């Protein structure tokens, strides 16, 4: 009998030549025409939001992603989380991934917070008994009290975000995907979220998108700058952020002069 233990891949995430295009239909009936006659003619234009994205994230790394609005950051996160698939290229995720805040978009407003927590935990890979055992800790972390057993259509956006964060914080994830998660509540709750992320970063893998450049420079081992759907720079945090900040400032100054 072999006593070998299969080692986990060194890379937590590997992205090779990933690209994403969306179909743009310019006329009202083009989508129907595509469904009926797409074999004969293309009735849409391709809008490429990501092009040739290649990178590797090692286990235990904290990677920051920066870029202006519309650069493709959210689409990249959606691909990593499995919400959408790349049009071409490959993405490999090795380990249990918890997409903080993205989970909130999957909640059913007609169900209670408790019911959505059960479903969310199952989506993230927990068994029913495991989820049930963690519900008290989840509701305590989320700080939503009696609303936990109320339909989520009664929740504010902040309460939805709190519950999503709380669920992701209790699923024993290997990888966290964080998209501006620290803007989900008051300073006390934001501090609680930051502490969880700091503790997780000691052993886990994190990808975080944030406009808080100083925070990224402090917590990340590397930073990726996405510009117009492509990786413009990926490396030492302070260097990448300095280049990104200079470019943004120059662009803003040019816009002010033109106004």
Where on the chain are the PLM-derived regions?
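Conserved ABC ATPase "signature" region
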Residues: 33-37, 98, 118, 130-147, ...
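Conserved H-loop
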Residues: 212-218
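Helical segment within the ABC ATPase nucleotide-binding domain
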Residues: 190-202
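Conserved ABC ATPase "signature" C-loop
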Residues: 228-229, 244
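Conserved catalytic segment of ABC-fold P-loop ATPases
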Residues: 218-225
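The feature captures the beta-strand-to-loop junction immediately N-terminal to the Walker
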Residues: 66-68
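Pre-NBD coupling/linker segments of ABC/ABC-like ATPases
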Residues: 1-51, 237-259
């Amino acid at each position: 009998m072999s006593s070998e233990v299969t080692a986990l891949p060194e890379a937590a995430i590997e992205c090779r030549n990933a690209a994403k295009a969306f179909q743009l239909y310019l006329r009202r009936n083009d989508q129907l025409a595509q469904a009926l006659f797409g074999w004969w003619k293309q009735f849409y234009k391709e809008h490429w939001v990501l092009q040739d994205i290649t990178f590797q994230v090692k286990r235990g790394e904290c990677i920051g992603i920066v870029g202006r609005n519309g650069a493709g950051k959210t689409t990249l996160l959606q691909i990593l989380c499995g919400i959408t698939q790349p049009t071409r290229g490959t993405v490999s995720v090795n380990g249990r991934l918890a997409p903080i805040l993205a989970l909130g978009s999957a909640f059913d407003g007609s169900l209670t917070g408790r019911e959505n927590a059960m479903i969310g935990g199952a989506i993230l890979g927990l068994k029913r008994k495991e989820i049930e055992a963690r519900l008290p800790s989840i509701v305590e972390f989320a700080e939503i009290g009696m609303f936990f057993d109320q339909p989520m259509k009664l929740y504010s956006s902040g309460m939805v975000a709190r519950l999503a964060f709380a669920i992701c914080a209790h699923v024993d994830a290997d990888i966290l995907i964080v998209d501006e998660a620290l803007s989900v509540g008051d300073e006390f709750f934001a501090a609680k979220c930051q502490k969880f992320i700091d503790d997780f970063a000691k052993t886990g893998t994190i990808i975080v998108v944030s406009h808080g450049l100083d925070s990224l420079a402090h917590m990340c081992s590397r930073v990726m700058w996405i510009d117009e759907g492509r990786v413009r720079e990926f490396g030492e945090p302070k260097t990448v952020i300095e280049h990104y900040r200079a470019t943004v400032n120059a662009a803003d100054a040019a816009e002010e002069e033109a106004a």
